[in-house]
Amino acid sequence: VLFHYLKYTSPVWYFNLKPTLDHAYFPTLAQLELDGVALEPDPAFTSEEARQRDLAYRAFQLGYINRSAMGAQPSAVWQTPKLPTEDEYRFLWKNFSKVWVVYVLIIRLISLKNPVAEIAGFLKSKNATRKLYHRNPIKYPDYPAFESKLVAAQPFVTVVIPTLNRYVYLKDVFRDLEKQTYKNFEVIVVDQTDPFDKSAYDGWQLDVKFWYQKDKALWRARNEAIQAAKGEYILLYDDDSLVEPDWIEQHLKTLDFFKADLSSGVSISTVGAKVPEHYSYFRWSDQLDTGNVLLKKEIFEKIGLFDTKFEKQRMGDGEYGLRAYLAGYRNISNPLAKRIHLKVGEGGLRQMGSWDGWRPKKFFGPRPVPSILYLFRKYHGNTAARWMLLKSLPPSIIPYQFKGNKILMVVGSFLSLLLAPVVLWQVWLSWKRSGEMMN
């Protein structure tokens, strides 16, 4: 990891792990100068190593993307030497809220680390200014006028949509697809609705293929649709979403412009947490959302299909995104291929589980759903999974629709203490079942 203390604040971040192929995710000063990006090391850090690592992290968060397939210099950050405690805290002050910096200090003190060094490092660095990267991201001014050869070549695209009891919303999906400026695509719908209504697919000016799947199995549906797809590119989509007419075109253009393998369109949810600020500009993507991502079909042929162990659970798309990243594929967060995610209350995965993976539907059900711990433990290890539990459990006590309310998130932390016996049971159950999934 870039800084050791990131293991407390971001224990399961994709970029804590070294990929097979490094695309200069964390560039050196020389790499930035080569690409004409004006960033300077922060002299407030006491060590040169910390200055270079902070510079690399800032470049990442500002949206630095190396566009030269041959020009990228591998990052030198995958092995982390011991850094001065003051520099560790300075990095936290610059990138996280005061709550999280205090959280790390408490964890370090409880862990019996040197209290003098920890408190001194905390206090000496607290004058650091919090960085708000979204206010001045790296821009790509040549993107609007970029004439994409990929778009001009008109590759065939397959849009994959699993659906379950959402015919009303599926109509809006089809209307948006009819309006697309890019026309060379097919649509495959795997319908799990009861009762199945074949007439829902009549009358649309689209190349629609569909079939009924009796089993309510989301990942099986996507896998079978991908196997049946004729497209050179697969565009994964949800049945409760809205997009602009240039949606497909922007996905393809972004792949071409950044020489990428995946274009992860941002998803603007109408329910839950606020929209992340980095959704407004291009950057390396640290997630994969199967409700809005375009990728080369050959990726599925090389690293496999979705892991069906996530069936009726959560984060199967997160696992695939991490798998693609580790295999060396370039994944771009694309603000110009956004979708509005309605997150309607009926149908879909909501019908089979809770609003998200950290809030069980049953009071004594596992928290989080076992597939989340399966993902964390499989790729990041048990220690990182435990740090993520410690960070994420308290706010999960509050219902999903209040996820963006900071005051209620604090209330959730206190409630988690009152409900500790129940929460510990839920976590034990999830840990046990995730272990069974790993065997």
What label would you give each PLM region?
Residues D54-Y57, L62-D87, N334-R359:
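Active-site donor/metal-binding and catalytic loop motifs
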Residues V1, W13, L242-Y279:
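Conserved donor NDP-sugar-binding/catalytic core segment of glycosyltransferases
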Residues P11-Y14, Y64, P74-S75, R108-D176:
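N-proximal low-complexity "stem/linker" segments adjacent to membrane-targeting elements
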Residues P84-S148, K378-N439:
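Non-catalytic, C-terminal membrane-associated alpha-helical segments of glycosyltransferases
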Residues T46-D54, K312-L322, N334:
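Acidic donor-binding loop at a coil-to-helix junction in glycosyltransferase catalytic cores
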Residues I234:
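Short aromatic/hydrophobic "clamp" motif used to bind/position activated sugar donors
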Residues Q213-A229:
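Glycine-rich, basic loop-to-helix element that forms the pyrophosphate-binding segment
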Residues R175-N184:
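Short, acidic, metal-binding catalytic loop of nucleotide-sugar glycosyltransferases
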